[in-house]
A protein has these predicted regions:
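Transmembrane alpha-helical segments of polytopic membrane transport and secretion proteins
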Residues: 1-32, 293-305
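Amphipathic cytosolic juxtamembrane alpha-helices at the membrane-cytosol interface
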Residues: 22, 101, 114-119, 187-188, ...
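Transmembrane alpha-helix signature in integral membrane proteins
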Residues: 80-108
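Cytoplasmic-entry segments and transmembrane alpha-helices of multi-pass inner-membrane transporters
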Residues: 101-140, 304-305
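Generic hydrophobic transmembrane alpha-helix motif, especially the helices
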Residues: 126-171
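Interhelical loop and adjacent transmembrane-helix boundary motif
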Residues: 150, 235-283
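Transmembrane alpha-helices
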Residues: 178-179, 183, 201-237
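C-terminal transmembrane helix and the adjacent membrane-cytosol boundary/short C-terminal tail
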Residues: 180-184, 188, 195, 262-305
Length: 305
């Protein structure tokens, strides 16, 4: 009884309107957090429930490491290794192009560009981020694909290379915008101290500012990778959409996302279940990328401390 009385004394109801408003806002923040977590949990449960049955029927090894996809054949095959490798190679290639270009652009905008140039470039990047995926795909199909075919003497330019270039352009706004914000947040004392010790502007930017902003820059890279690996429409218009192994940059390929988009409208039975399994694999990939990058960043922060 005494313990209950003490607990009741500790729980004090808000008295003033400001305290009531604070209590209501705290409850709303808590509710929004629970809602966000609940959405992730529901999506995860739905993906697992929809994707696991096909994997059980097909077999995990045959599904993940099979090299042939023929879902509408008389004897259907459900091997998604070509899709996995195409997505990995495409995302990796786009990252290798987009990250250096995006980071250098962010450093330029944050540290070197004049006000007028910064305004023009930032406006262009904001416009680029607002362009729909289908427009990127249309431009790639009409301009990039024929250019690749002519430049390399190929019958068709719809291939892995075209997809990589389009994805690299599409991830630039995410990387640049977040990186600029992170670089602008670096305390000016860091740079002033470096310059006072005799370092050049370039040395200060890349040895002081960029390492100090690495968490924010990494967040931009994660957003870019997420956009690249999850893109479907633009890739479907420039990659060729043939379920081939990506053994060449000029090979017509199918990504995990485009396999789903291409067949889901008419799929049924085991074929539809297999497409949900592909979505589950894609979901796991994105989660693993986020976890690995978070672990690496936290490890780097602990080492610095």
């Amino acid at each position: 009884m005494k313990q209950n009385a003490l607990l009741l004394k500790k729980i004090e109801l808000p008295r003033t309107p400001a305290e009531w408003l604070e209590a209501v806002m705290n409850f709303l923040f808590f509710l929004c957090g629970i809602l966000a977590v609940g959405c992730v949990v529901l999506i995860s449960v739905y993906m697992i429930a929809s994707g696991v049955p096909a994997i059980r029927k097909i077999g995990l090894f045959r599904f993940l490491f099979g090299t042939e996809w023929a879902s509408t054949a008389a004897d259907p095959k459900y091997g998604i290794l070509p899709f996995i490798l195409s997505s990995v190679y495409g995302t990796l290639g786009a990252t290798l192009i987009g990250v250096p270009v995006g980071l250098l652009t962010a450093v330029f905008l944050s540290k070197a560009a004049g006000p007028r140039v910064r305004t023009v470039v930032v406006t262009a990047i904001e416009l680029l981020s607002g362009i729909p995926s289908v427009v990127f795909g249309l431009l790639g199909m009409q301009v990039l694909v024929p250019a690749v075919a002519r430049a390399f003497g190929k019958a068709s330019g719809a291939c892995l290379l075209s997809a990589i270039v389009v994805l690299a352009i599409m991830i630039l706004p995410s990387i640049v915008s977040v990186s600029v914000t992170a670089l602008n947040a670096v305390p000016p004392e860091y740079e002033q101290g470096s310059l006072a010790l005799g370092a050049t502007d370039t040395e200060t930017w890349f040895k002081i500012s960029v390492p100090a902003a690495k968490s924010g820059i990494a967040a931009g890279i994660v957003l870019g990778i997420g956009r690249a690996i999850g893109e479907a429409m633009a890739v479907m218009m420039v990659a060729g959409n043939s379920p081939n192994m990506p053994d060449s940059l000029f090979r017509s390929v199918t990504f995990l996302t485009t396999a789903i988009a291409k067949e889901m409208s008419y799929a049924s039975g085991l074929q539809k279940q297999a497409l949900f399994s592909i979505a589950l694999v894609l979901f796991v990939f994105i989660m693993l990328i986020n976890v690995v990058l978070n672990v690496v960043l936290k490890g780097g922060d602990r080492d610095e401390r």
